From Swiss-Prot:
It is found in: Cytoplasm. GO terms for molecular function: aspartate-tRNA ligase activity; aspartate-tRNA(Asn) ligase activity; ATP binding; nucleic acid binding. The gene is aspS. It comes from Ruegeria pomeroyi (strain ATCC 700808 / DSM 15171 / DSS-3). Its EC number is 6.1.1.23. This is Aspartate--tRNA(Asp/Asn) ligase. The lineage of its organism: Bacteria, Pseudomonadati, Pseudomonadota, Alphaproteobacteria, Rhodobacterales. PROSITE patterns: AA_TRNA_LIGASE_II. Disulfide bonds: none annotated.
Length: 593
């Protein structure tokens, strides 16, 4: 017999009754029934009930074991009495009578219990992550993650892609976040960087003549943490292809992701890839207040400025006299009660706005009546025009925000989400995907007037050099994101592979030719040697698994995540370097006040 086990703790069934077996695992739960000890023995695969009484030579030793001790038992498989069968367990028809016990590892008093559903502070869970990971939900999440990655790999290989690894230590590159710098011992005063993404390398792979690349790539970014983002590192399904259009990229990655969500989505509806809408970035902001809309929510915001221009509601009327302002309406079907309207108004105030105007419609017997402060100020003709434009009726409401769109769109998007959730409009058993396209390449700083890249600096401008010679703020890129249920899952672009267009694009953002060559020298030089048109994207594995696991926090699907302050409490990172380490690297630490 094997030194530790003949079966896993999920393998034994009624067919094994009478066999002598060996199991190893953790003591999940101990129950003393008056001289008979019952132990739920757990391993990665499942749970088996084992028992022991005073007739067994192992009884005295088994009395001493406690939760989370790691033990090995030898025993005989017995059938449970019919009234004691547990249909919820694969091993629920049997139990193992213990004849021999070996303690493989004792456990001290536990800082958190593995058994049960008790909640613990995240700090405790992360400090003792190896215990937290023993919990059933965490085991399921990590297994799901492994299965998702394996499925992605298989699907990419089936599409003719090959997996190539790119360097983990490279040069610093401005790609939208702060780099993690690594000092060089051999080159004092110089630094490597951990890659924010394999961006330049995967493009160089295309220039090298490889047609289809992918990898499960680690990425490192020094970012502020969020519930859906790690502050230090994450993994992505990274891919790139030569001789492709934007639609080719969509047609490649969409079936892969749809297949993964169908395979692991637990029966939730997955929109077919051909039904994933392509929404312009400007329209996404206008309709949903975000470039990662949750399309499970049917609410679409609309511009209602004309109904307030010159109206009796002075706040909006005067606002519209300013250039670049508008009034945006958020329809709220079934939200037509003063209580709900007041609650949403309070929500806007918590978000830092003065409030939200609202109108709700009710049946007054003789016909439809518009109610609320706005309705009183703008009159029945305007409120009726608004109602018809928004397609609302009795029992419905509409909320209004005004100003320059960038000043209120974020709050409007949040309000749309809250309205959809509270009114039961948002589907909960569906994965709704949408491509966001036509991203602006540039943005202008309102204070300085300077132009900088709004998104990926490596994307090909629509219209090429001719577009760059016109108004920079009108230039759109062959750049795209894929949103699902309010999260950005994929980001990508058709790349700018022509050196003269690359120089012009960076020039408009204030980068001189020398700086471009210094920062992106390898890529810039490679483009002088017959670079093919190419494009690709990257899908965030952590967020995908988070959605599939129905978790609200990305740390629930990462094996050893950092906390909100970018600290690893278990490994005590970041740590202070020793004086010898600093001396060897030619560094000294200067702490700023």
């Amino acid at each position: 017999m094997h030194a530790y086990r003949s079966h896993t703790c999920a393998a034994l069934t009624a067919a094994n009754v009478g066999e002598t077996v060996r199991l190893s695992g953790w003591v999940h739960r101990v129950r003393d029934h008056g001289g008979v000890l019952f132990i739920d023995l757990r391993d990665h695969y499942g749970v088996t009930q084992v028992l022991c009484d005073g007739d067994s030579a192992a009884f005295a030793a088994l009395e001493k074991v406690r939760s989370e001790w790691c033990i090995r038992i030898d025993g005989t498989v017995k059938a449970r009495d019919a009234d004691l069968v547990n249909p919820k367990l694969p091993t629920g028809e049997i139990e193992v009578y213990v004849r021999e016990l070996e303690v493989l590892g004792r456990a001290e008093e536990l800082p958190l219990m593995v058994f049960g559903d008790q909640e613990y502070p995240e700090e405790t869970r992360l400090r003792y992550r190896y215990l937290d990971l023993r919990r059933e939900a965490m085991q399921a999440n990590m297994t799901l993650r492994s299965d998702v990655v394996a499925s992605m790999r298989r699907r990419m290989w089936d599409k003719g892609f090959r997996e190539y690894q790119t360097p983990i230590i490279t040069a610093s590159s401005p790609e939208g976040a702060r780099d993690f710098l690594v000092p060089s011992r051999l080159h004092p005063g110089r630094f490597y960087a951990l890659p924010q993404a394999p961006q330049q390398f995967k493009q160089l792979i295309m220039v090298s003549g490889f047609d289809k690349y992918f990898q499960i790539a680690p990425c490192f970014r020094d970012e502020d943490p969020r519930a859906d983002r790690s502050p230090t590192d994450f993994y992505q399904l990274d891919l790139e292809m030569s001789f492709v259009t934007q639609q080719d990229v969509f047609d490649t990655i969409a079936p892969v992701l749809a297949g993964v969500f169908e395979e692991f989505g637990g029966g939730r509806k997955v929109d077919a890839p051909q039904d994933w809408p392509q929404i312009a970035y400007a329209d996404a902001a206008k309709w949903y207040g975000t470039d990662k809309p949750d399309l499970r929510n049917p609410i679409k915001m609309q511009d209602c400025s004309e109904h307030f221009r010159g109206s009796g509601f002075a706040i909006f009327a005067k606002l519209l006299e300013q250039e670049g302002t508008e009034i945006r309406a958020i329809p709220a079907p079934t939200g037509g009660s003063r209580k709900f309207c007041d609650r949403m108004n309070a929500f806007a105030q918590k978000e830092g706005l003065p409030g939200m105007g609202y109108i709700f419609w009710r049946d007054q017997g003789e016909g439809l009546e518009a109610a609320g402060p706005l309705a009183k100020n703008i009159g029945p003709e305007r409120t009726e025009a608004i109602r018809q434009q928004l397609g609302l009726g009795v029992g419905d409401a509409a909320f209004f925000l005004g100003g320059k769109p960038k000043s209120f769109e974020k709050v409007a998007g949040k309000a749309r989400d809250v309205i959809g959730a509270e009114l039961g409009l948002t589907e909960t058993d569906r994965f709704a995907f949408a491509w966001i396209v036509d991203f602006p390449i540039y943005e202008r700083d309102e204070e300085t007037g300077e132009i900088d890249f709004e998104h990926n600096p490596f994307s090909m401008p629509q219209g090429g050099m001719e577009a760059l010679n016109g108004d920079p703020m009108a230039v759109r890129g062959y750049q795209y994101d894929l949103a699902c249920n309010g999260y950005e899952l994929v980001s990508g672009a058709i790349r700018n592979h022509k050196p003269e267009i690359m120089l012009k694009a960076f020039e408009l953002a204030g980068y001189g030719a020398d700086e471009v060559k210094a920062r992106f020298g390898a890529l810039f030089n490679a483009f002088h040697y017959g670079a093919p048109p190419h494009g690709g994207c990257a899908a965030g594995i952590d967020r995908i698994v988070m959605l599939l696991a129905d978790e609200a926090n990305i740390r629930e699907v990462m094996m050893f995540p950092m906390n909100q302050r970018a600290e690893d409490l278990m490994m005590q990172a970041p740590s202070e370097p020793s004086s010898d380490q600093l001396m060897e690297l030619g560094l000294r630490v200067i702490l700023q006040d």
